[in-house]
Amino acid sequence: MEILKSMIDPKIVMAIVISFIVASILGPIIIPLLHKLKFGQNIRQEGPKSHLKKAGTPTIGGLIFIFATIITMFIMVGNPTDEAMIALYSFVGFGFVGFLDDLLKIIKKKNEGLTSGQKMILLLIVSGFLTWYAYKYIGTSINIPFLNGQINFGLFYIPFVMFYFAGVTNAVNLTDGLDGLATSVTVLVTTFLGIISYNLGHISLAIFCVALAGALLAFLRFNAFPARVFMGDTGSLALGGAVAMVALILKMPLILVLIGIIYVIETLSVILQVASFKLTGKRIFKMAPIHHHFEQLGWSETKIVSVFSIITVVFCFIAFASL
């Protein structure tokens, strides 16, 4: 009943509708502009050969749902709470790092943007401020799923949160490897976080979450196979920053292991692949991240996205049961 109540609240419904409409309007404006500016995606040669035909598809499309979410937030919440503003900062801050990375890839005309050092410094600046905020205003305790208890990290909270932001943003970035995959999964993740935020009384935060979900639903029309636009690192890092910060505000960073199970699997597949090859000279998967493994097995992009989305739904229900 609480879930149903949150989804029929007029503010929640309006936020979803407005962000969907705004993103639907922005898409046909931004996509042709990206074409005109020749902001096309460079495809990795070592990736699946079927992806080579995607070269030139406009990237940096994450701007569509970033702008739509921001516009909706300020329409629906004239004076957002501090927690909603810090979630927006995380969303835009990480997205800006991704934007710089995408821009350099386009300028260089190859799939290499910021150097690892440059990217690390920028991400540390963004996550460093967020970690300071979390330590000072959110507190150092986090909830443990299924156990109905908390653990206080004390000073260890600082390195934990820094590692957490790096892990979540990179995990979402790895998931963005198929048309519509990161978009579909994150629609479900942000919807879950919106429901929990609402039920815990964080109304501004809930509006941010569902506004993002509505914008992503509209973006999916342009990003689903065959994609007319890619979100780029602009979008994937922004999404990682958003879900990471919202879960942290709710003191539920560990819940992302459940609702973000696809992010976790994608990341683990890369770690295991690299470790196995370095230790034994053999690969566990045909290709990593794991969505490419299923492509090599003959699965269509649409099938992979559908299956991964269903898995996310199942784990969202498991996450509800854990609270």
Curated annotation (Swiss-Prot):
It holds the Pfam family Glycos_transf_4. GO terms for biological process: cell division; cell wall organization; peptidoglycan biosynthetic process; regulation of cell shape. Keywords: Cell cycle, Cell division, Cell membrane, Cell shape, Cell wall biogenesis/degradation, Magnesium, Membrane, Metal-binding, Peptidoglycan synthesis, Transferase, Transmembrane, Transmembrane helix. It catalyses: UDP-N-acetyl-alpha-D-muramoyl-L-alanyl-gamma-D-glutamyl-meso-2,6-diaminopimeloyl-D-alanyl-D-alanine + di-trans,octa-cis-undecaprenyl phosphate = di-trans,octa-cis-undecaprenyl diphospho-N-acetyl-alpha-D-muramoyl-L-alanyl-D-glutamyl-meso-2,6-diaminopimeloyl-D-alanyl-D-alanine + UMP. Pathway: Cell wall biogenesis; peptidoglycan biosynthesis. One of its GO terms (cellular component) is plasma membrane. It is an enzyme of class 2 (transferase). Signal peptide: none annotated. Its main location: membrane. GO terms for molecular function: metal ion binding; phospho-N-acetylmuramoyl-pentapeptide-transferase activity; UDP-N-acetylmuramoyl-L-alanyl-D-glutamyl-meso-2,6-diaminopimelyl-D-alanyl-D-alanine:undecaprenyl-phosphate transferase activity. It is a multi-pass membrane protein. Its cofactor is Mg(2+). Its EC number is 2.7.8.13. The chain crosses the membrane at residues 12-32, 58-78, 84-104, 120-140, 151-171, 177-197, 200-220, 229-250, 303-323. The keyword Metal-binding applies. It is found in: Cell membrane. HAMAP family: MraY (MF_00038). Belongs to the glycosyltransferase 4 family. MraY subfamily. Catalyzes the initial step of the lipid cycle reactions in the biosynthesis of the cell wall peptidoglycan: transfers peptidoglycan precursor phospho-MurNAc-pentapeptide from UDP-MurNAc-pentapeptide onto the lipid carrier undecaprenyl phosphate, yielding undecaprenyl-pyrophosphoryl-MurNAc-pentapeptide, known as lipid I. This is Phospho-N-acetylmuramoyl-pentapeptide-transferase.
